[in-house]
Each structure stands twice: as structure tokens, then as C-alpha cells.
């Protein structure tokens, strides 16, 4: 059964949740903690607008983001240590889907989310790099390492291939 409602109803969170709204949106990149960049390539070049995805994502009973695990013949990973631009925070993102699987992030801590995303969604070529990043993260609730969290983006700009990240430089 398909139910059609006006945007005024959908934008009201309590109405949208009561209707069981499921929001499915596209991600350009996601970080291993579940933050999503839907609009900017490498954080600076706008690829598309955000439209109403923020309202739908925050209001939905279930918010799902889909993305291929890589782009440009595997040289760009859709999953990075930290997104270069933030459109949707981990607080609104419930599920991420790629051709490799589904990461259900509901009720998980940042480290649990990272492991779930790496295990289920990341391209096999990038899993070791992201596992190493997670292991070297600063101890804390969200183990980011600000000295190297943008290494994937820096390597893409320098060599054109995120595979070439070398954590020993950091």
C-alpha cells in the first residue's frame, strides 16, 4: 500500500515517524563512524544539492544511505576516516548499504559503528587501511586522529589514488 502525503506532513517529525517513513538517500562519501557527505567532492566541489534529504533523514523512522564502495575505477574509496564535508551526522544515519553489504548502525557506539561499516560495506582493497586507521586512533569515545584523518583526501590530491596512503608518514 502506497500512501502519498504533502511535504508539510513529511517535514513534521512526529507525523513522518508515525507513518513509518523510510528515507533512502545517496552518499558521495561516508566516514567509518557513520557521518555522510552527500554533496561535495573532496569537500570543496559541489556535486549536487542537499534538497530535502536532511529533513527526510532526521524525520524518518529508518534512514538509509546507499553508495558504491569505490569510484574512479577503485582509486577513490567512498569510505574514509573522516568525511571532507558533513551533510548528515551519525546521529541521523541508521543504515548504510553498498554492493558488499549492509551496516545497521542503530544502537552502536562509534567504535562498533566503525567496525560494522568496515566489515560490511568497505571495498576489500581499503579494509586494511581503515582498520589500521581505527587502531591508531586517539583513545576516546570517537577515536579520531586529527593528524591523519584526511590522509585519504590528501593522497587523492597528490597521487590520484587513495590506495597509496602510507600511515607511517603520520
Where do the protein language model's features map onto the residues?
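Metallocofactor- and cofactor-centric catalytic cores in central/energy metabolism, strongly enriched
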Residues: 14, 29, 33, 42-46, ...
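A short, aliphatic-rich alpha-helical micro-motif
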Residues: 4, 16-18
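Short loop/turn motifs at secondary-structure junctions and domain boundaries
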Residues: 18-21, 87
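Single conserved hydrophobic/aromatic residue that forms the stacking wall/gate
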Residues: 1-7, 11
